[in-house]
Amino acid sequence: IGPENGVFAIVDADQITQVFTNIVKNALQAMQGRENSDIIIILKSHIKNNLAICPDIHTSNMNWIEISISDNGPGIAHDVREKVFVPNFTTKNTGAGLGLPISKNIVEGSGGKIAFQTSDAGTTFFIYLMKA
């Protein structure tokens, strides 16, 4: 994440682009056929505060960047929530079920964390990366 906004993260640019692509692609698929579909991406800079979605970050002395990607799709069904990061798991007719597992590996391989919150009003993925 770069100089355009003055916030720098420790992550490979090509890899984090793949993470964003995977999450946004899933969001677009989830909202397919819905009117007034929105995807909102927010970047926040944190110093160990307000990170309730990923509490183990609180124990770290690092400063974090939070990127949230939200959609207003139908949300992730209860019975699949624990499987979204499992390789080869998919609820779709096409695809290999690798987008979110690859995203998790990239984020965690960069020393970060990925988590999500979901309801019938939509889903938000949270990506936490160490500030450079």
Write out the residue ranges for each language-model feature.
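Conserved catalytic submotifs in the C-terminal HATPase_c
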Residues: 1-7, 46-48
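Conserved micro-motifs of the catalytic ATP-binding
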Residues: 8-11, 91
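Short beta-strand/loop element within the Bergerat-fold HATPase_c
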Residues: 38-50
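Short conserved segment of the HATPase_c
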Residues: 62-64, 76-88
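Acidic ATP/Mg2+-coordinating residue in the GHKL
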Residues: 71
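Short alpha-helical Gxxx[C/S/T] motif in the catalytic ATP-binding
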Residues: 99, 103
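Detector for a conserved hydrophobic position within an alpha-helical segment of the HATPase_c
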Residues: 107-108
